Amino acid sequence: MTWSRFHNSSEPMHCAVAEREGKLLGMVHYIQHRSCWTTVDYIYLQDLFVEPQVRGSGLGRALIEHVYESAAKSGASRVWWLTHESNTDAMLLYDRIAEKSGFLQYRKLI
């Protein structure tokens, strides 16, 4: 994993953190990108992490809502993300704040 792109102002990558008393409790990073389907950008929420001891406190929702606000300010028309089908705890949150797209992901590592 590399964090160098977050420090490069020409990269459309962003990160937000939540902390209390200097301790990191959660983070989200997201990427603004173009799409062939629209003339405005999309935001891909690439990673969301919340420390286990504060899960269920609303912190994950707050981090996602930060991404929504950032997307709106940038003129993006959509925020989207992926999750593993076994991540049922997170999906309880996602089902309340977004809609399932119905798409399945296929990939081949190169």
Where are the model-predicted features located?
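Active-site rim helix/loop that mediates acceptor-substrate recognition in acyltransferases
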Residues: 1-15
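Residue-level recognition of the GNAT/N-acetyltransferase active site
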Residues: 33, 51, 84
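A conserved beta-turn-beta hairpin within the catalytic core of GNAT-like acetyltransferases
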Residues: 35-45, 55, 102
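Conserved acetyl-CoA pyrophosphate-binding loop and the N-cap/start of the following alpha-helix
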Residues: 54, 58-66
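Conserved active-site alpha-helix within GNAT-family acetyltransferase domains
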Residues: 61, 73, 85-104, 108
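Conserved GNAT acetyl-CoA-binding A-motif
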Residues: 64, 71-83
